[in-house]
Amino acid sequence: MDNNKKDFKPYIPADKVVPEFTVTALLIGILLAIVFGAANAYLGLLVGMTVSASIPAAVISMGIIRVILRKDSILENNMVQTIGSAGESVAAGAIFTLPALFLWAEEGKIDFPSILTIFLIALFGGILGVCFMVPLRQALIVEEHGILPFPEGTACAEVLLAGEEGGSKAGTVFAGLGIAAVYKFLADGTMLFKSEIGHAFESYKGSQVGIQVLPALAGVGYICGPKISSYMFAGGTLSWFVLMPMIALFGADATIFPASKTVTELLTMEGGGPSALWSNYIKYIGAGAVATGGIISLIKSLPLIVRTFKQAIGSMRSKNGAHKGLRTEQDLSIPVLIVIALVIAVLIWLIPTFPVNLVGALIIVVFGFFFATVSSRMVGLIGSSNNPVSGMTIATLLFATVILKATGTTGITGMVGAISIGGIICIVAAIAGDASQDLKTGFIVGATPKKQQIGEIVGVVASAAAIGFVLYLLNEAWGYGTEKIPAAQATMMKMLVEGIMNGELPWALIFIGVFIAIVVEILHMPVMPFAVGMYLPFSLSAGIMAGGVVRILVEKKKGTEKEKKARTDRGLLFTSGMIAGEGIIGILLAILAVLKIDSKIILPFQLPQIGSLILFIALLALLYKVCMKADKE
C-alpha cells in the first residue's frame, strides 16, 4: 500500500464505476447497524466500553455477498461496513449519557424519556457528526495521506483488499457469534449454569472474589489486550480487596452518607453483603475516578486538540477545488450540509419534546463542530480506541450545566437539558471519528466519498431508530446502575450534573476517587481503564482479565511475525463474533424478561459453581485453539 500522497492510486480507479450504493449493501448494512448497535449498547452498559464494528461488518459482508450471493464488489462491502459501523458509534454516544434520564425517572424526578426523544437525540447527534466531518475529508484523508495513519480505517481496507479470504474469515466471525449465543442462552436463559460465581470472605469482611463467565467479557479482554485488561483488573482489586474491607473495618458501626444503615447492617441484611457496599459507596468513588480520568485524558490531549483544530481549519481554507469532477473526490455539498446543521439547531430549540433551550442549541453547534473536528483528526493520529470522547463529553457537560444554571435553567430541567446536550455531543464526536475511519478505508479502496457519506447517514438513521427500544428493554429488564447493568459512564455523568446543580452528593467519596485517579496518573498508568475497573463489579473485571490472559498466551506462542499476526487477527474476528452473539441473546433475554415469560425456559436443575468455571475454561481453550488454527491456513 503506497503511503506517498502524490503517487497514491486507489484500488478501484476513479474512472472505473463498480456496484457500490446498492440495495444489497443497504439492506445488509442497515441490518448490521442495528445488530452491532444493539450488541454494543448491551456491552457498553455492562463493561463501560464498546468495540469497533468496521472489520467484523466488512468480513460478514464479504461472506454474504461473495460466498452466498456469488457477487464480488469491494465497494459494496465497503458500503456495508460504513453503514454497519455507524450503529456502534451511535450506541456508544447514547449509552454513555442517556441512561441518566432513566435513572432520574426511576427516582420519580421526571417522566421516562419517550422513544421519540431518544431517537431525535441520536439522529441529530449522528447527522451533525457527519455534517461537521465532511468538510474535513479533503484535508485529513487526502492531503495528509501517509501522515495520519488512521489505524482502524487502514486495517479495514487491508481486510477488504484481502477479500479472497472473505469466506473463511466470515466463517470465523459467525462461529464466534453462534457459540457465544448458545453459551449465553444456556447460562442466563435456561439457567443451566451460573453466569457469575463468587465467594465472600467472612474473615475479611467487605471483600468478595468472583468472575462472570461470559463470552463477551472474554472477547473484550482479548480485543483490548493484556495491558488494558490488567489495568481494569487492578482497579477492581483496589475497590473490592482494599477500599471495601477498609470501609467494613473502620466504619462498622457508622452510618455513612448516602447509605441510611450502618455498614454492619449493610453487610448482614438480606440482599446485602459486599454488593451493598459497592452500590452505596464504591460507585461514587469509582465515578469520581472515571470523571477525573476523562478530564486528565482531555487535558493531556489539549496541545494536540488545539494544533489539530488549527491545522484542520487552515487546511479547509487553503484547499483548492481540483479534481472535484473525479468520482473519488465527490463530497456532499458543503453549503447544503451547513443548512442541514442550522436547521437541526433550530429544531433542537423549537421541538417541544426536546429538553433543550436556545442556549443549549447554540452550545451544541459550537461544541459539536469543535469536538467533531478534534475527533476526526485524533482518530487519524491515535486510533478510535484512544479517542477521548468521554473527556469531551465531560467538558461539554461541565460547561453546559454551568451556563444553563447561570441563565436560569436550574433544577431537574437544567439537569435533563445538560444530559441531552452531552448526549448529542458524545454522538457527534463518536460519529465524526467513525466517519473519518470509514472514509479513509474508502479512500484506499477507491470508494465514492459522497455515497459513503450518505451511507453513514443511513446507518445513523437505522441505529437511532433502534437505540431507544434497546435502552428501554435493558432498563425494564434489569435496571441501570445495578450490578447487572452498571452503566458506569452514564451514572457518572448523572452525578456530575447533579453535583453542579444542587450539590447533593457524597463529595468525600467522590474526592477519594478523584485523588486515586491522580495517584494512578502520577504512576504513569492509564487512568480511564483503571477507573472503570474501580467502578465495575469485580466479577466483570475478572472475566475481562481472563480474555487478556488468552491474548498473552497467543502472543507468546513461537512463530514468525506473519504467523503471530495471523493468530491474533483470527482471534479478533472470533471474539468480535462472540461479543455480537452475546449482545443479541442479551437483547432477546431482555425481551423475554419484559414479557414476563423468561421463567418458562428455565431448566429444573443447575450445575454447581465448579461447572460454570469448567465451561468458561473450555470456552477460553476454544478461543486459543481458534487462534492457533491460523497456522494451518
Model segments located where?
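Alpha-helical multipass membrane-protein architecture
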Residues: 1-633
